[in-house]
């Protein structure tokens, strides 16, 4: 099973055009997970034409997105429990976004935590839990490249990778 992972699209209503590189890659996935800051459900509409979509809301999402997706969840794919959280809470500059994401699932059995918020691609193991941030496909901030993620789940293993590109067109 291949899961497309995206976060921080930050697209405004009526101006939704997801990058061609992302759309092309997500045509081949079995499921898509969005980790917040959709900004409009038009992003959901575009992605859901490619594969089933789930996700969570981020700190820039409105009531409609929060109501539809919630702000934290655990999903299971082929027996692998995956935690989804945006990564902005608790509001504190004393801990990093990965630390906030990890803290959100403290005491909960998950194999992998997917998070966004920082727009920074991230891939690390933390005490046996895979921590993965896909970066942003549309708003790279200080990063050199735009990015999204792909997770392959095979035999109970999660095999993550980032997809990087220069042009968001």
Q: Which residues fall in each region the model found?
A:
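A short, sequence-level motif marking secondary-structure junctions
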Residues: 87-91, 164-169
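Active-site-proximal beta-strand elements of phosphoester/diester hydrolases
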Residues: 2-10, 81-88, 129-135, 160-162
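N-terminal active-site segment of His-dependent metallophosphoesterases
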Residues: 1-53, 62-71, 79, 144-147, ...
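Active-site-proximal segments of metal-dependent phosphoesterases and phosphodiesterases across multiple
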Residues: 13, 61-109, 139-142
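Conserved beta-sheet core of the metallophosphoesterase superfamily
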Residues: 54, 93-162
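Active-site neighborhood of phospho(di)ester-bond hydrolases with catalytic His/Asp-centered motifs
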Residues: 5-7, 31-37, 54-59, 84-86, ...
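Short, flexible, glycine/charge-rich loop motifs used to bind or transfer phosphoryl groups or to couple energy/partner
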Residues: 20-24, 43-46, 72-73, 101-104, ...
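Short active-site segment of divalent metal-dependent hydrolases/proteases
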Residues: 11, 40, 89, 120, ...
